[in-house]
Amino acid sequence: MASAKEISQYLKRFSQLDAKRFAVVKVGGAVLRDDVDALTSSLSFLQEVGLTPIVLHGAGPQLDEELTAVGIQKKTVNGFRVTLPETMAIVRKVFHATNLQLIEALQRNGARATSITGGVFEAHYLDQETYGLVGGISAVNIAPIEASLRAASIPVIASLGETPSGQILNINADVAANELVHVLQPYKIIFLTGTGGLLDADGKIINSINLSTEYEQLIQQPWVYGGMKLKIEQIKHLLDRLPLESSVSITRPADLAKELFTHKGSGTLIRRGERVIRATTWKDLDLPRLQHLIQSSFRRTLIPHYFETTPLLRAYVSENYRAAVILTKLGNVPYLDKFAVLDDAQGEGLGRAVWSIMREETPQLFWRSRHNNQANAFYYAESDGYYKQDHWKIFWNGLHHFQQIQQCVAHCTQHPPTLID
């Protein structure tokens, strides 16, 4: 799946969190119906490595089927399922049955799991005249969740609420997930879907979204509309209320471990992200912080007087100095002198966000990389071509004439290293 180093890095990061801050996993009824084996396998794996996710589920398709069987037609208003008193008994039965099916499937996989079908969401009528027995959430009681976590058992929570007087109310699973996340402030929020992520105009999964730099442009794309637009807006609202390090992952059940434990991931990773600083002179940057970023990323030391002797063309630096691109000029084409990302920012999509901003205004570019650089796979994907030498791989973008490429290769060959082993 990934290198042992990558897996160990993420496992260490997750293990240092308070148990209830690791992850909330929201599972739709369709996943429970169509992909329960992959779901339980992935959740069981997390428990095996010492992590306990908090699972919240819906039961939409199961409820549709049960209501149809008794001749009751589904009715929704503003995205909420109208729940009449005569259907509440069916709603409750379906949620309890769905919850127990997941519990039993987890137990067959050797996992410990706790059924929680009440006592978490204190609710009020959202609008009884319009929606019937549909609730909004007044308060979240995490005591049942904490008890389950103390026993190293996966809490499996149904999206049902109760009023202070004891009336059970149907709660939209997305609403329940949002309120639960707001209280728990988890590091990861995971939405498991059949599509495995958000899809772009070509139907391909978007790897990562850095909301600070990409949201406004993304939301204006013609292919972002309807349910997808609403989902992105909801996720932005959700992350705006969480710590900066929190993120949302949208993936398939079978790919959950890959999404959590590898830099590349498998699905769509969405973070609030960081603003990117653009500078054309060194004096506009915090050079000690930039030096720390570069040296930590490469695990090498910059040559003395690097900033004094290196003519800066442009620098793109994340506001917390966790990722940076430094461009200089060798000849007539911008030269990528440094692309640095801190270890704790690996897999966030932050490096890609900084890279994308740089590429938008740098149509021509060349750079070199050592043969053992872990970023080479990314460079192969991002470059138009490359040339292999004894000590370097030389990459370029936007260069179409052989003589120009030859000059860039010569510059890379002659340019002395700026990092000391």
UniProtKB/Swiss-Prot annotation:
Residues binding substrate: A59, G60, R81, N170
Pathway noted in the entry: Amino-acid biosynthesis; L-arginine biosynthesis; N(2)-acetyl-L-ornithine from L-glutamate: step 2/4
Cellular localisation: Cytoplasm
GO BP annotations listed: L-arginine biosynthetic process
Keywords, in A-Z order: Amino-acid biosynthesis, Arginine biosynthesis, ATP-binding, Cytoplasm, Kinase, Nucleotide-binding, Transferase
NCBIfam families: argB, PRK04531.1-1, PRK04531.1-2
Family: In the N-terminal section; belongs to the acetylglutamate kinase family. ArgB subfamily.
Name of this chain's protein: Acetylglutamate kinase
Source species of the chain: Xylella fastidiosa (strain Temecula1 / ATCC 700964)
